[in-house]
Amino acid sequence: MKKKIAVLLGGNSSERKISIKSGYAILQSLLRSGFNAYAIDTRDFPIMQLKKQGFDSAYIALHGTGGEDGSIQGILEYLNIPYTGSGIMSSAISLDKWRTKLLWKSLSLRVLPDIYLQKKDISKYTYSYILKKILKLKFPVVIKPNNAGSSIGITIVNHPDLLIDSINLAFNYSNNIIIEKFLKGTEYTVSILNKKVLPPIKIITKNNFYDYSSKYIESSTEYICPSGLNYQKEEELKKIVEIAWNSLGCKGCGRIDAILDNKDKFWLLEINTIPGMTHRSLVPMAAKSIGISFDELILKILKINK
């Protein structure tokens, strides 16, 4: 008898739409491969009923809060249902950008200087206090939600007059935010499949950075794979990514973003433990560059689930 697989998608996070696209692409792939798979929107389905409904395994296609933060992983472990991707602790830390950076920094991996602000303490911060901190970083800065993905709620701020609106925007998506030094450089993303680091992809966008529009809307964004890095530099980047990935105890499939500055140094940006699987997604592109089709990729991820 075939195993009954729940493709968990949708949810309540700000990345719901992308999750649905990813989830249905995964579902169709599993069906093509002959699996007994079903789409389960965690916003509407009582997740504690998965076992009673006969599901044997879960393929997590949820993005952001409720999917990448360890909560769904905890429920699945309680239900004793195997699932794809990283475990509870790795997921929780990885979605927390600030704590991820603290860990990477402790390993002497380059991360950009930042300021961490919590919504519950915002009344303690005066405008002059925040501005004084930012002036140490120097403008421009990037203001981003601490616990959100897909570049949602992120703005680049070049002038003090734009600070308050940008901070409030970021707080709409997370109770904690990061104000980070903006670094102009060449962006790369590196995918990991099980313990294998896939070829880096160079990202060229006409926008100031690789934002939501660049990822999901703009057709002008270019993805270069092979990346154009020389062998030594590419191996350096892959090694940095491998260390960063393993430090968090991640498993399965993921992606880490980095930027190369004008002094030829790589800086880590952030990690994605449940990367998108849409037609514009980068993990399938990296896999394809070494001969792994989309359906083969989905099967490989399924086979290394917990």
Curated annotation (Swiss-Prot):
EC supergroup of this enzyme: ligase
Record carries keyword Metal-binding: yes
Cofactor: Mg(2+); Mn(2+)
Alphabetic keyword roster: ATP-binding, Cell shape, Cell wall biogenesis/degradation, Cytoplasm, Ligase, Magnesium, Manganese, Metal-binding, Nucleotide-binding, Peptidoglycan synthesis
Stated name of the protein: D-alanine--D-alanine ligase
Cofactor note: Binds 2 magnesium or manganese ions per subunit.
Annotated residues for binding of Mg(2+) 1: 257, 270
